Amino acid sequence: GGSGNLYGALPALGGASWARIDFSNSNDFTGAAKATGWAGKLGLVWRAAPEVSLGASYQFKTSLGDMKTSRTGATLSASPDAGSFTDSGRMTVLDFQWPAMAALGVAWQATPTVLVGADVKRIEWADVMKSFKMRYDSAGIGGSVSLALPQHWKNQTVTNVGVAWSANAQLTLRAGVNHADNAIPDLYVNPIFPATVEDHYTLGLGYAFTPAHELNVSYAYAPRVKVTSGGGVTITHKQHNVQLMYSARF
């Protein structure tokens, strides 16, 4: 749906080979659309035995306001075959929330130098990813247009297993595996949310220069997954992720 001059101009864009709304920015850590809100998390740990600890946590669904850009923080454009249409305005992402999540975990000190951990998480995607809703309000020609991308994600179970070996007082080596069922039905998958990978394999090491200074490095690999959407679009996705972290304790 929509209103005003912008909504009236949409039929003229029907012959465009492409049209898009861009509200990205050059910041690696924050986007152009921002919101405030709150969330909460509860957890407990029980030392069941000297070598065994059990844990549980619950993360509440977020309560975020609508994410908005500035008044001219988004652009709507179309290909030259539609008359090179360009407009600026505000993009609003409506009621986008992070889901509730429950987790159970166990840690076992198998030997003085080997720690084994495992946990299982249940993520309630179905409650927050039914539809991705947006509204564009033109600051140029006036009017607005509302958009919705059906998602219909399913709830997801994620299992993690990892091991850490203290090679000596300074060096710790780590490895792990993560498996999750795919939360996105093939019919609704799209490049905006290519969250189709199901498995991750990780390696890591930590080196303590002193009790107060430590360097940690990790690598995660997600094998390639290929999915064809209901519209016939094929999406392939794999991941390589490297992290480097230096810690200083005061």
Regions found by a protein language model. Give the residues of each.
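Outer-membrane beta-barrel porins/channels
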Residues: G1-F250
